[in-house]
Structure formats: structure tokens, C-alpha cells
């Protein structure tokens, strides 16, 4: 057996987190406190410190808020100037930032709760502008979808996926979440979606962030939603619902063009359709021959998919390929569930958990900003690396704070000299 010596020096295995804490403070602290307001004037923690403490949980490999007190406090508190708060303080802050649910009644008389969390949604956009991830006056591509979060909280409702939970509507630009509005899990995806999207668009436009192209699934294919989306973007691309009138038009079509997309052979065509009275749009039709050879009662030997759009210039192939990129956004939800705590919601009610969803969305957006600034190849990382890889290859490095010549210095115990460029701040 190897000889063991015990050293009582204050070393931490999370040496990489300190530079991230400093960058969070430099980039976002002022934006957070000016948007949410000062939480205290003398003693206590500001909201920027609370969000930074929550960020450290997930960027150090934690899975729930309590990890900051149970496992990380003794390491994070080694920083000479930046304070870390307890899990109880984070949970109290979530309650303080909670806004009341809005209850809507459907035509059938059923009631559904929504939570808009306006202030936190505004902060989400302002933080992206402060990071430089969004720029005022520019146009972006926009995606919207509903994510079903499985949970057995007090007010969780049964979803169509056969589990209890919530179904928040999530708006995404590029790889960044720009808006979240939570809803009861049993709410139909189209119910009040127009109002949700309109609020998200108006928040973006208030910050002079504009939408060039919007992509959505068939849950957004209704007249009132399409009218509203068209008013806030140049072009929209929405998966169209199939109906008997569409089949009559599709079966009579000629001039199908055979193309290969991602190694799969499809046939493409497009027509003008009047899906709603007096409103003609372009319908891009994609069909694929059934592999099993069986005939469908409606579609025959093909499987049909349609995209409704007001883009009359792009080719059918370009439109299909652009719409297919929407599938990559599912990675964001997977990332939030497994890396940023969406699968372990901390509170018992939807209104409070909505604040948590937005807090962690802000943290993930900040993580993406860090990956853009970091010379990832020097740490064996890529810009698309997941949080677990980031923890192993960047955060997990032995370190020790010392004070010499009236200055605080962080000693990093690593043969990777790239860390030297990250710790050049004088803490006096």
C-alpha cells in the first residue's frame, strides 16, 4: 500500500470556477441588479450574487440547489471578494421574484393557469445583450416550441404524454433561450399561444431585436397564430396540418422533383393554397416512399409532410433544409433537463418554478457566452461541449488562494499554461 500523508492546506478541486465567477460579475451583475432592483441596501445578498451562486452549482457539476450548501460552499467561499449564498437564500429569492399566475378559461369552460414572469423574461433578453450574444438593431432566426417537463409537484397536471408536469412555451434564437412562459401540463398547445408569442415578440422588439424568419411546428398552425407571427417577422415556416382538402390537391400534383437530403431521397413540390379564406400562402410539400411497402388509407404509398410559408422566392429544397434545422433545438431542452436542473425543479408550485426555469436559462446562455470567448481547444473542449465535459476539462483543476505582497493570487496546480491567461485580476 502506498504511503499517505495528510495536508491540511485549503486546496479546492474546483479551481476553474473562480474565473467564471469573475466574468459573471463583470458581465452581468449590473444588468441583473438594475433590472430586478436592489434586494438589500446594507447586509444580505443582491440578486446578482444569488444568480452567481446558482450558476456555480451547475458549472461545478451539481444537480440541485442544495448542492451549494452541502458540497460547494467551503470551496466557493475561498474567493477573497466574491460571496456565495446558501441554498435557503436562493430559494427565498425565487419566492421574492415570483409573479402570480394568470387563469384563462377555454370555450368549453375549463380553466388553465399561465405564468408570464415578465420581469425575469426581460432580464433574460437584457443579459443576452449585455453578453453581446444579441445585438440591438439586428435580425435573427426564431424558433418556438413547447417542452413537457415531467414533475409531480403540487399543481402539476396530466399531459398528453401520460405523465404529470408543466408545458412551458420556449422561444429560442440561435442556441439561446430568449423567452419562457409556463403553462399547465394539460393545456392544449394552441390555447392562448397567440398571446404568448405576441408578448415574446414585443419584449424582443422593445430591445430592438427583430425576427427575420420564424419556425414552428404544427401546434402553431392556426389562423390567429399565423396572422400574429406574420406581423412580427419577415418570413414564417410552420408545419401544416394535413386535411382532406390538402390530399385532393397533393394527389393531383405533377412535376415532383427528386432530391437527396441528409442521405434520404425525397420528392418535393409546392403550390399556393388558401388555407383560410382570403389568405393564400405557399405550401411546400415533401413526400417519401414508404419503406415497408404498405399502403396508407389516406396517403397511399407515400408519407407526406407540408410546410406553410410566406416565402415565395426560396426553392422548395432550401425551405425544407431550413425547417429541418429546427430539430437541432431539441438538444437545448435535453441540455436544460440534464445539465441545468429542469428535471429537478426546486419548488412546489408552477409560479415559483417558472422563475427557476428562467434563472437556469440565463445561466445556460451565459455558459454559451463563456464557450464563445474561451480558447476551447487549449482545454480539449469544443464550442458545443456539454456542461459535464466542461466540468471535467476546465473546472476540475486543483487550486489554492494565497496572499503575497498584499495581493491575492490563485495558484493553479496544472501543466496547462492556458489557465494563466484567465487569472490576471488584482483583488488587492
Regions found by a protein language model. Name each.
Residues 1, 31-34, 72, 298-303, ...:
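Short acidic (Asp/Glu) and glycine-rich catalytic loops that position anionic groups and cofactors
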Residues 1-163, 170-186, 193-207, 396-428:
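Dynamic "connector" segments at or just before major functional cores
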Residues 53-54, 68, 86-90, 140-148, ...:
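Short, conserved catalytic/metal-binding motifs centered on acidic residues
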Residues 68, 259, 316-350, 355, ...:
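Short amphipathic alpha-helical "interface-anchor" segments enriched in bulky aromatics
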Residues 147-149, 176, 183-185, 243, ...:
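Short, glycine-/Ser/Thr-/acidic-enriched flexible segments
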Residues 188-245:
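Domain-level cores of phosphate- or acyl-group-handling catalytic modules
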Residues 235-338, 424-428:
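An anionic, glycine-rich sequence signature occurring as long contiguous blocks
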Residues 343-374, 378-406:
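Basic, amphipathic alpha-helical segments enriched in Lys/Arg and hydrophobic/aromatic residues
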Amino acid at each position: 500500500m502506498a504511503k499517505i500523508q495528510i495536508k491540511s492546506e485549503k486546496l479546492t478541486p474546483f479551481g476553474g470556477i473562480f474565473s467564471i465567477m469573475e466574468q459573471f460579475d463583470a458581465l452581468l451583475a449590473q444588468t441583473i441588479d438594475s433590472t430586478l432592483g436592489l434586494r438589500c441596501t446594507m447586509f444580505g445578498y443582491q440578486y446578482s450574487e444569488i444568480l452567481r451562486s446558482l450558476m456555480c452549482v451547475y458549472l461545478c457539476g451539481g444537480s440541485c440547489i442544495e448542492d451549494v450548501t452541502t458540497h460547494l460552499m467551503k470551496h466557493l467561499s475561498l474567493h477573497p471578494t466574491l460571496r456565495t449564498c446558501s441554498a435557503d437564500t436562493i430559494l427565498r429569492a425565487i419566492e421574492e421574484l415570483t409573479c402570480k399566475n394568470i387563469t384563462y378559461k377555454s370555450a368549453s369552460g375549463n380553466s388553465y393557469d399561465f405564468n408570464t414572469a415578465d420581469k425575469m423574461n426581460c432580464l433574460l433578453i437584457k443579459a443576452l445583450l449585455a453578453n453581446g450574444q444579441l445585438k440591438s438593431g439586428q435580425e435573427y432566426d426564431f424558433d418556438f416550441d413547447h417542452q413537457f417537463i415531467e414533475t409531480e409537484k403540487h399543481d402539476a397536471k396530466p399531459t398528453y404524454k401520460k405523465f404529470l408536469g408543466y408545458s412551458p412555451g420556449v422561444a429560442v434564437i440561435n442556441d439561446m433561450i430568449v423567452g419562457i412562459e409556463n403553462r399547465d401540463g394539460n393545456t392544449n398547445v394552441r390555447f392562448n399561444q397567440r398571446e404568448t408569442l405576441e408578448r415574446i415578440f414585443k419584449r424582443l422588439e422593445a430591445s430592438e431585436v427583430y425576427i427575420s424568419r420564424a419556425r414552428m411546428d404544427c401546434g402553431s398552425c392556426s389562423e390567429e397564430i399565423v396572422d400574429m407571427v406574420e406581423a412580427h417577422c419577415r418570413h414564417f415556416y410552420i408545419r401544416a396540418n394535413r386535411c382532406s382538402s390538402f390530399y385532393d390537391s397533393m394527389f393531383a400534383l405533377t412535376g415532383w422533383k427528386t432530391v437527396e437530403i441528409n442521405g434520404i431521397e425525397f420528392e418535393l413540390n409546392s403550390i399556393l393554397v388558401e388555407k383560410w379564406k382570403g389568405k393564400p400562402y405557399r405550401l411546400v410539400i415533401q413526400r417519401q416512399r414508404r419503406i415497408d411497402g404498405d399502403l396508407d388509407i389516406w396517403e397511399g404509398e407515400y408519407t407526406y409532410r407540408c410546410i406553410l410559408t410566406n416565402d415565395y422566392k426560396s426553392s422548395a429544397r432550401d425551405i425544407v433544409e431550413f425547417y429541418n434545422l429546427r430539430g437541432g433545438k431539441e438538444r437545448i431542452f435535453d441540455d436544460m433537463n440534464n445539465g441545468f436542473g429542469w428535471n429537478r425543479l426546486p419548488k412546489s408550485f408552477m409560479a415559483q418554478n417558472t422563475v427557476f426555469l428562467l434563472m437556469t436559462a440565463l445561466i445556460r446562455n451565459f455558459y454559451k457566452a463563456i464557450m464563445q470567448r474561451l480558447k476551447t481547444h487549449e482545454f480539449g473542449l469544443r464550442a458545443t461541449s456539454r456542461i459535464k465535459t466542461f466540468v471535467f476539462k476546465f473546472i476540475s483543476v486543483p487550486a489554492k488562494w494565497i496572499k503575497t505582497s498584499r495581493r491575492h493570487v490563485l495558484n493553479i496546480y496544472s501543466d496547462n499554461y492556458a489557465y494563466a491567461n484567465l487569472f490576471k485580476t488584482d483583488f488587492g
